[in-house]
Amino acid sequence: MDTPLVTDDLDRTLAEQVLTLAEAARAADGVAPLSEHTLLRVRHGAPSGSSRFHLALEDGRAVGFAFVERVAGEPDSGEVVVHPDHRGRGHGTALLHSVDRDAGPDGVRVWAHGRTPQAVSVAREDGWTAVRELHKMRMPLRDIAGDEPGGPWEAPELPEPELRPEVAERVRLRPFVVGQDEQAWLAANARAFADHPEQGQLTLDDLLQREVEDWFDPDGFFLATAKDGGVAAFHWTKTHADGAGLTDGEPVGEVYVVGVDPEWQGSGLGRALTLAGLRHLRDAGLPWVHLYVDGDNEAAVRLYESLGFAMWDTDVMYAPPRDDAPRPNV
């Protein structure tokens, strides 16, 4: 087997092949193997020095792919996918080894989405260990019948969001305005996620790329703005036209990201904006909403459970064996 090709840039042909194999894996496994961020990097390219693309090739065609994002002072963060028709040939292991060899000074971590048997098997056989979990939670926005996927399940009540009087005097809730709110939102996002490298370091280019995606809807992007024009908190919702594995193709919603500026923590804005977004998705006629939350964020899990969400699935981040640890012979 050839060593995977490693590059800082993908030409259009390879990018299309990666998108095709990722869709084939999603259809076979029932879970998307690559995050939205990775797919945007494949489609639009990445800033110089920020990313690495690893490709397993057969007859010049991409049959396996790994993406690695580099953030200074943090371990590289990656994802790996192999086309369903080309599994069992060592491509997954070869890509993991390639990512590990190419890692930056702080090492590398790799996500496995949905705990698919193939991903878990490859990681364990090669000595990688789980170091982080990202829970997926779901909630119905209408009553789900017993003969529907996920049913039966009665939708919870979603009360109108209310702000405490002392908070309501200082902020107002409104939708995001394209061309006006980008910089204020980026500043608030960086403060809210200062300890979260994947989310907290989003750039203007990252935001603008999302604004031209088919799913983007500023009316579903809720801000709490202070009198000085700054963003105190926000809730960005998203609609998945393909059902995101929750339906047989009927669109569903997502709590895409909720953030609160540290100065506004404890104000109740997070809950109020979450409710505003959920009611927006419900009123759009969507049957389900889902979200992602870090496994160690117990406060957020409790908040979402209090609103009616329940655990659905888990993504797992793996770390490679220590340098002095023997690798299994696979």
UniProtKB/Swiss-Prot annotation:
Q: Where does the chain bind acetyl-CoA 2?
A: 258-260, 265-271, 297-302
The residues listed in the UniProt record as binding 1D-myo-inositol 2-(L-cysteinylamino)-2-deoxy-alpha-D-glucopyranoside, with positions renumbered to this chain, are: 36, 198, 238, 254, 292
Q: Where is this region: Disordered?
A: 142-161
Q: Is rRNA processing found in the keyword set? A: no
Q: Note the Pfam families from the entry.
A: Acetyltransf_1 (PF00583), Acetyltransf_7 (PF13508)
Q: What class of enzyme is it?
A: transferase
Q: Which reaction does it catalyse?
A: 1D-myo-inositol 2-(L-cysteinylamino)-2-deoxy-alpha-D-glucopyranoside + acetyl-CoA = mycothiol + CoA + H(+)
Tell me how this protein assembles: Monomer.
Alphabetical list of HAMAP family matching this protein: MshD
Relate the protein's function as given in its record: Catalyzes the transfer of acetyl from acetyl-CoA to desacetylmycothiol (Cys-GlcN-Ins) to form mycothiol.
Q: What is this protein called?
A: Mycothiol acetyltransferase
